Amino acid sequence: MVQKKPINRSLRGRFITFEGGEGAGKSTQIRLLAKRLEKARLRTLVTREPGGSPGAEAIRSALLAGIGKLIGGADAEALLFAAARDDHVRTLIEPALARGEWVLCDRFYDSTRAYQGKLGAVSLDLLNALQQVTIGDMKPDLTVILDIPVEIGLARAAVRRGSETPDRFESEAIDFHRGLREVFRQIAAQEPERCALIDANAEPEEVADRIWQAVRLRLLEPARAGAKSA
């Protein structure tokens, strides 16, 4: 099995992923964080999953239309997500990190663990194998998990969607979304060194301040301390 070579961490940028249920406010918070990072004179790249690169965006359209259910169910869907991630990481994320950019990504492999693993009935062995092929030992420097009551999140998503038809995941039953929230909370508890669980049931600016504090304490201040001691 092919293993990805790690990027030289002394030269690379930083990789921050955003996770959470529907309507948690990921897109808004990514935009607000990007503005703060750019104000701090840090080059940023905003992207998303599934998608981000031309090949992955094509797969995204098929996934959100529900093609996974048509061609084989949860396992087929997991394979499509893996194909999209491989293209995304290889053609967009890794080159940006190598250039020293800060990459902000709307969803990453934690969403795969939640949607396809815990709630999609895909075996852990298959997910681990796909993860090894697509990203190897690569991990985000920080994962922001936006936590919000399910009913509030779905109401926000409905307002955002307007008259458009709900996508493949927004159409799931309420119990699915409750389970999803619990999985993300479990991930945050299991990996506190990587994850910051943020209460997203507040005004966007207040949530943004909480995220900025996590970024500052976990990434910016350690980097500055390291630069001074070098």
Swiss-Prot record:
Q: Which InterPro entries match?
A: P-loop_NTPase, Thymidylate_kin-like_dom, Thymidylate_kin_CS, Thymidylate_kinase
- What Pfam families does the record tag this protein with? Thymidylate_kin
Q: Which cysteines are joined by disulfide bonds?
A: none
The EC category is transferase
Name the family the entry cites.
Answer: Belongs to the thymidylate kinase family.
What is the designated name of this protein?
Answer: Thymidylate kinase
Q: Where do the annotations place ATP binding?
A: 20-27
Taxonomic lineage from the root: Bacteria, Pseudomonadati, Pseudomonadota, Alphaproteobacteria, Hyphomicrobiales
**Keywords noted in UniProt:** ATP-binding, Kinase, Nucleotide biosynthesis, Nucleotide-binding, Transferase
CDD domains xrefs? TMPK
Protein purpose? Phosphorylation of dTMP to form dTDP in both de novo and salvage pathways of dTTP synthesis.
Q: Name one GO molecular function term.
A: ATP binding
- Superkingdom as given in the UniProt entry: Bacteria
Look up the EC number in the record and give it. Answer: 2.7.4.9
Q: Which PROSITE patterns match?
A: THYMIDYLATE_KINASE
What does the entry give for GO biological process?
Answer: dTDP biosynthetic process; dTTP biosynthetic process; dUDP biosynthetic process
Q: Which reaction does this enzyme catalyse, per its entry?
A: dTMP + ATP = dTDP + ADP
